[in-house]
Design a protein with these regions (language model features):
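Low-complexity, flexible helical/coil segments
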Residues: 49-52, 114-117, 138-140
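P-loop NTPase switch module centered on the Walker A-proximal segment
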Residues: 1-105, 109-111, 145, 154, ...
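Canonical P-loop GTPase G-domain recognition
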Residues: 128, 137-163
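Active-site glycine-centered loops adjacent to acidic/histidine catalytic or metal-binding residues
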Residues: 134
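Histidine-centered acyl-transfer/condensation active-site motif
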Residues: 131
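Amphipathic helical hotspot of TIR/SEFIR-family domains
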Residues: 110-126
């Protein structure tokens, strides 16, 4: 890890409904940044952020964890939070340390109750919100359907990035 000035560091909380793929997305970010050379899998119990024995056993995040990622001269502290309501305190804790929120949705499930809840948390905190539609490799996933659901639930300000 290099040394970074404060204006080159971002704290981004990753939030979303349970099983939307937040931890797997964090693993993909780590491998693409070169921080790791093999992507861990939740099912195999070898991800960077879900290291607690109970998380490995349950195959889900129970506590908030921070994953530092260096990318294009910036340092991103990705704050991986649990997706189930039982651990809402952990989500709020992660959001408290964040400059922005990345809400992860499953392209198959679309907008879920947990998605709506974390959106409310981020709006209350007043941080910029980004959405990431995940799990697009599922044959029943639909980016367009998920985008339309997001516009319906969160307003017309939802605009896709076409890059």
């Amino acid at each position: 890890m290099g040394n970074f000035k404060m204006d080159s560091i971002r704290n981004v909380v990753m939030m979303g409904h349970g099983k939307s793929g937040k931890t797997t997305l964090a693993e993909a970010m780590l491998i693409n940044s070169g921080a790791i050379d093999r992507m861990g899998k939740v099912a195999d119990g070898n991800t960077i952020s879900d290291y607690d024995p109970e998380e490995v056993k349950r195959q889900l995040s129970i506590q908030t964890s921070m994953i530092p990622i260096e990318w294009k001269g910036m340092k991103y502290n990705m704050i991986d939070t649990p997706g189930y309501f039982d651990f809402a305190g952990e989500v709020k804790e992660g959001l408290r340390a964040a400059d922005s929120a990345l809400i992860v949705l499953s392209g198959r499930s679309g907008v879920s109750v947990g998605t709506e809840q974390v959106f409310k948390y981020a709006k209350i905190k007043g941080v910029p919100i980004m959405f990431f539609v995940n799990k697009m490799d599922d044959e029943r996933a639909s980016y367009q359907r998920t985008l339309e659901e997001m516009k319906e639930k969160f307003g017309k300000s939802i605009t896709p990035d076409r890059k």
